[in-house]
Amino acid sequence: MQNTIRIVGIDPGLRRTGWGIIDTLGNSLRFVASGTVTSDGDMDLASRLCQLHDGLAEVVHAYKPDEAAVEQTFVNKDAVATLKLGQARGIAMLVPARAGLHVSEYAPNAVKKAVIGVGHGEKHQIHMMLKILMPKVEFKGDDAADALAIAICHAHNRGSNRMRQALAG
């Protein structure tokens, strides 16, 4: 008998970190909640990271996910921005890990491929597929939508991993 697994997807960012919660049972996906955690750009970096930490900790505490998935970051030409994004990503991985959750990581192209079928796509395609896959989905902004896509990517990968284990066993 399968159990419902609750997944939190996290799209890390220093200004806005998106989060999305889904429940999965077999191949079935159900939207639970989504949103963003923001940091105050007028504050110093350490304070902003604390804001992200505290906001994500509230989400994890409130929704009690079983597993977490975080999008990997890419390196861009602005080294300072890349480092700051990496620090925000560290917070995005730390919070669920400290709550005892297994944290998986996915490249942006893998997330898009899992949701829209190709590794390169537009935001509106992700939004459309979220509405098809989970008709009751609600999200405000790209960050929350991306976080839901990350959670879906993890749900699909969990299914593939279970299939491989069953065939090998």
Swiss-Prot record:
Gene3D superfamilies: Ribonuclease H-like superfamily/Ribonuclease H
The keyword Transmembrane helix is annotated on this UniProt entry: no
Cofactor: Mg(2+)
InterPro entries: RNaseH-like_sf (IPR012337), RNaseH_sf (IPR036397), X-over_junc_endoDNase_Mg_BS (IPR020563), X-over_junc_endoDNase_RuvC (IPR002176)
Disulphide bonds in the chain: none
Positions contributing to Mg(2+) 2 binding: 71
The keyword DNA repair is annotated on this UniProt entry: yes
Subunit structure: Homodimer which binds Holliday junction (HJ) DNA. The HJ becomes 2-fold symmetrical on binding to RuvC with unstacked arms; it has a different conformation from HJ DNA in complex with RuvA. In the full resolvosome a probable DNA-RuvA(4)-RuvB(12)-RuvC(2) complex forms which resolves the HJ.
Name recorded for this polypeptide: Crossover junction endodeoxyribonuclease RuvC
Species: Rhizobium etli (strain CIAT 652)
